[in-house]
Amino acid sequence: MYRSMKSLALLGLLGPTSQVFAHPATGHAHNIGRRGVDIEAFRLPQVGSYTNATEIETTPPIALLKRESYVETATELVKKLAPNSEFRLVGDHYVGTNGIGHVNFKQTVHGLDIDNGDFNVNIGKDGKVFSYGNNFFKGEAPEASPLKKRDFKDPVSALKGAKDVLQLPVEAASASAEPKEGTEVYSIKGTSGTVSDPEARLVYFVKADGSLALSWRVETDITENWLLTYVDAETGTDVHGVVDYVSDLANYRVYPWGVNDPTEGDRVLVTDPWDISASPLTWQSDGTTNYTTTRGNNGIAQSNPSGGTAYLNNYRPTSAARNFDYQYTTSLTTPSSYIDASIAQLYYTANHYHDLLYTLGFTESAGNFQINNNGKGGVGNDFVVLFAQDGSGTNNANFLTPPDGSNGRMRMYLWTMSTPRRDCSFEAGVVIHEYTHGLSTRLTGGPANSNCLNALESGGMGEGWGDFFATAIRLKPTDTRATDYSMGAWVYNNPAGIRSVLYSTSMTTTPNTYSTINGVSSVHRIGETWATTLYEVLWNLIDKHGKNDGPRPEFDSNGVPTDGKYLTLKLVLDGMALQPCSPNFIQARDAILDADKALTGGDNLCELWTAFAKRGLGSNAVYSSSNRRDGFNVPAGVC
């Protein structure tokens, strides 16, 4: 079966054209920003800790803990470390391809979730505790259940409070609340302006000052933003935090895998490009239907000139022979004339990336995006909806990541920085960056929790992971550690790209260290430092293990990638699943180090520590939300 390219876009919304050349945009919820509300002010507080594998080894009561199953071991650990806390097991535990079991817990009070009270436990191959992250509330819980007196605002009032504070385009004058299954969960009927009925759930929320607030978690999908708004249940007007499932990106164009954009190569016709181990149903079937259009188990791609959320009846190319071979040149001036090529490119790139991530460990049980999970765990029914030439914006792209079981949604826009305009579906780096938001959001904190990358430093790493994966995948056979890369250069029509730095191992070209992010409020600027650090890791491991320039990794008998490039991607991906909810740089660093211990027995700790230390994340680095301190030390005995 034949098919041409398909691709997705990346990067965050950049803002007005007059500002784009100076800096990328600073936040995710830019449609809210256009209404005058800065959603950045409502990011979730960064709390919690991560206890790494080395620390576990020096704590015998924990290191020796073992029960009959990995879930029971994890549960026993939480009981020991939080003996006075109520909690529940989140039903998204799984064993990763590296043999590490991941178990997530949610703290509760009087039967209500503390929605940002998370505890993740990682269990090693030996059945013992490997590492853990703890975001549990440690203060005094309220003595009386709020459900007895019920002196709190109703869910409709909370929706109206969220609407007023965030200036949401929602009409709720005639709204009413209908109970759903669960404790104090309601569907709010009679609204307009949302994709689906808003939902309100009574929860507790740990505020930035460490206190606990009874809150309504109001969920609203308003097309460009899918928000969880924590509204104080006592006042109905105070907003304690906002999570946006949508992650913003930039637009890129794609050719065959490894060709980042039209400046790097020509379009070619590829045949059956899927990895059958990652997509056993191929890209053209979901196990029930064999499709002759750009639809399959991993995604569905179509045009979306209206910018809406409907997709099933949108236009997509059809070929009975599955020969998605359409004309495109960069000189074409009317985007609609090459929409078939754009959709095919987007579909190809997204599916190819799905397959690569699958081989690296982003599988069904880990929360990947598939309709049919083939009985391999996870929830399923959540392929990625891919919108080409989306009409809801320009000069950007975005990705929405709800929890496992709900569709991811990618919007690729046209870019107006050149004549003719450029379609970001043809820049693979944009697609990869965007899709990586789905990867990092699903893995961090578990597939059922999409709230764990909302804190400022965590959100910055979300942007950095996207840039890093896109950059690593585009490496060329002749590249060395002296090779520098920009992001989004083609769609932006500027060799410097959309970021303020080049990704480089040169401290002269890009001098960023951990302390560089002090005082920075832009997740994209924070992400530049994280991606730069990972670029150092990449080249240290390539220099040690070589570089596989093929489209897929090769593994040794222990499941370890045999080259430095794919080994780095594997360790970074595994680290996402190990790290706690709302991680900071140091915790994410520790999780990557732990990932190497789990996968290779720590064979690469010298190279990893050396890379981190070069960028200020050595063993003596210190996290503080306002005064991060660089550390350039490598632990004694590591090298």
Curated annotation (Swiss-Prot):
UniProt keywords, alphabetically: Glycoprotein, Hydrolase, Metal-binding, Metalloprotease, Protease, Secreted, Signal, Zinc, Zymogen
Record-given protein name: Extracellular metalloproteinase mep
Transmembrane spans: none
Propeptide: 23-248
Gene that produces this protein: mep
Protein role: Secreted metalloproteinase that allows assimilation of proteinaceous substrates.
Keyword Transcription found: no
Induction: Expression is controlled by the prtT transcription factor.
Ligand binding (Zn(2+)): 433, 437
BP terms from Gene Ontology: proteolysis
Family matches, as InterPro entries: FTP_domain, Fungal_virulence_M36, Peptidase_M36, Peptidase_M4/M1_CTD_sf
Enzyme superclass (EC): hydrolase
CDD domains in alphabetical order: M36 (cd09596)
Record: active site: 434
Names of required cofactors: Zn(2+)
One term of GO molecular function: zinc ion binding
Top-rank taxon: Eukaryota
Membership in a protein family: Belongs to the peptidase M36 family.
Cofactor note: Binds 1 zinc ion per subunit.
Signal sequence bounds: 1-22
Entry-listed glycosylation sites: 52, 290
UniProt KW Iron keyword: no
EC code: 3.4.24.-
Pfam families attached to this UniProt entry: FTP, Peptidase_M36
Gene Ontology CC entries for this record: extracellular region
Location in or out of the cell: Secreted
